UniProtKB/Swiss-Prot annotation:
Lineage of the species this protein comes from: Bacteria, Bacillati, Actinomycetota, Actinomycetes, Bifidobacteriales
Keyword Acetylation annotated: no
Family annotation (Pfam families): Ribosomal_L1
A GO biological process held by the record: regulation of translation
GO CC, one annotated term: large ribosomal subunit
Organism: Bifidobacterium animalis subsp. lactis (strain AD011)
Molecular function as annotated in GO: rRNA binding; structural constituent of ribosome; tRNA binding
Keywords assigned by UniProt, alphabetized: Repressor, Ribonucleoprotein, Ribosomal protein, RNA-binding, rRNA-binding, Translation regulation, tRNA-binding
Gene giving rise to this polypeptide: rplA
Name of the featured protein: Large ribosomal subunit protein uL1
Subunit structure: Part of the 50S ribosomal subunit.
C-alpha cells in the first residue's frame, strides 16, 4: 500500500469523518489545506440512486460553468469541407476527417474534448472503445454532435463540462481550480449539481443523491451531506 505524503496526511487529519459537510464548508476546508506548487483541480463525485443499465436512468448532460474551468480545453473536431474550415476559424485545435479518425484509432489522444458533425458519425462511431471510456465520445445530448461547430467549440473553450453516470452509479465532474474564490467554486458546483438534479429520472424512487464527496488533485475527499446539495 502506497504511503501518503505528509501534506496529504495533514489534510486528512483536518477532515472530521463523523461529519457531513455542506458544499460551502467542504470548499472552505479544501482551501485551508496545505498548499502545493501548482493550481489543483477541484472535483466532485455524486453517488446516484440509479441503474445505468436502464436507458431511462442513464444520467448525462453538460453545463457551462459560470466561472469557467480554469483551463483552456484542447478541442478536436471531426468535420469535412466548409465545416472543417469553420471549426478552425472558431478556434478548434485539431480538425480532420477520415485520416484523423484513423489517427485516433491508432492511439492519438492529445485532446480534451471532441466535436463531430452528424455526417462524420458513421466513421467516428467505431472509436467508441477508445473515446467512450474516457468520456470523449461525441453525443447530440451534450451538443457535441452538431452542425453548429462554432457554438460547440465556443462553449467548450468557455468552460463547458460534460458529465455522465458510470456503471456503478457514480457521477464525477471537475468544477474549477483551487485558486478560484470560494464563491466562484460554489457557484460552479451548484450549476452542475442543479442540472444533475433537474435530470433526475422519473422512475427513480426515494433519495436521488445518496452520497457525495468534494476533493482536489492532491487532497483526500471531503464527505458532503447529500441533503445540502
Amino acid at each position: 500500500m502506497a504511503k501518503h505524503s505528509k501534506k496529504y496526511r495533514e489534510a486528512a487529519e483536518r477532515i472530521d469523518r463523523n461529519n457531513l459537510y455542506t458544499p460551502e464548508e467542504a470548499i472552505a476546508l479544501l482551501k485551508s489545506m496545505p498548499a502545493y506548487n501548482f493550481d489543483q483541480t477541484v472535483e466532485a463525485v455524486l453517488r446516484l440512486n440509479v441503474d445505468p443499465r436502464k436507458a431511462d436512468q442513464l444520467v448525462r448532460g453538460s453545463v457551462n460553468l459560470p466561472n469557467g474551468t480554469g483551463k483552456t480545453a484542447k478541442v478536436l473536431v471531426f468535420a469535412r469541407g466548409p465545416k472543417a474550415t469553420e471549426a478552425l476559424e472558431a478556434g478548434a485545435d485539431i480538425v480532420g476527417d477520415d485520416d484523423l479518425v484513423e489517427k485516433v484509432a491508432n492511439g492519438f489522444l492529445d485532446f480534451d474534448s471532441v466535436v463531430a458533425t452528424p455526417d462524420m458519425m458513421g466513421k467516428v462511431g467505431r472509436l467508441g472503445r477508445v473515446l467512450g471510456p474516457r468520456g470523449l465520445m461525441p453525443n447530440p445530448k451534450t451538443g457535441t454532435v452538431t452542425m453548429d461547430v462554432t457554438k460547440a467549440i465556443k462553449d467548450i473553450k468557455g468552460g463547458k463540462v460534460d458529465f455522465r453516470v458510470d456503471k456503478n452509479g457514480n457521477l464525477s465532474f471537475l468544477f474549477g481550480k483551487l485558486s478560484f474564490s470560494a464563491e466562484a467554486l460554489d457557484q460552479n458546483f451548484r450549476a452542475v449539481a442543479d442540472e444533475v438534479k433537474r435530470l433526475k429520472p422519473a422512475t427513480v424512487k426515494g433519495r436521488y443523491i445518496t452520497k457525495a464527496t468534494i476533493s482536489s488533485t492532491m487532497n483526500p475527499g471531503i464527505p458532503v451531506d447529500p441533503a445540502s446539495i
